[in-house]
Amino acid sequence: RSTGWIPLFAENNQEAYDNMVQAYRIAEHKDVRLPIMICQDGFITSHAVENIELLEDDIVKTFVGEYEPEHYLLKDNEPFAVGPYAVTNYVMEAKRAQMQGLRNAKQVTLDVAKEFEKISGRSYGLFEEYRMEDADYAMVIIGSAAGTGKDTVDMLRKQGVRAGLLKIRLFRPFPAEELSLIHI
């Protein structure tokens, strides 16, 4: 949490690819400017052979856009230092900026996902709801276990159990307020 990284989780290789394309836009957004990690289950998905739909390179390049840094590192008339070390009198300012970027990441993630849907036809949010509309029980899952979880929900539904699934995509900042609005 205190590192300031934004973890985006993927259920499968398609989501890992899609998250990677979106991650550049989220991380480089002027209201975020924080690193993102694309999280996928080691071996379960990382070593799996799975078909995915790739976007054309020119479409991805247009979507991601050119990197436009707020500050260039090598400007002799505007020198500044970059690094993980912060002296005592700067720590609070740095942490405050980091936390503000994390707070902003929720809306930026949703905005980028809407734009991504226009070019890919694939929709993403902060989390995915599966059969939650009338669920009495819900599984909360991250990563590749969601596929098995969805099959389990379907089996439970056939047995008359009103089960559902919530798959977390954006883990930090955690979408607690948004999750609290879901029916269960």
Where are these predicted regions, by residue range?
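Conserved thiamine diphosphate
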Residues: 1-35, 39-42
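Conformationally flexible catalytic loops at phosphate/diphosphate-handling active centers
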Residues: 35-128
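A generic structural motif
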Residues: 36-41, 162-171
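A general structural motif
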Residues: 108-124, 141-149, 168-176
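Redox- and metal-dependent alpha/beta enzyme cores, enriched for Fe-S-associated oxidoreductases
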Residues: 133-161, 174-179
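Conserved small/polar residues in nucleotide/adenosyl-binding loops
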Residues: 182-184
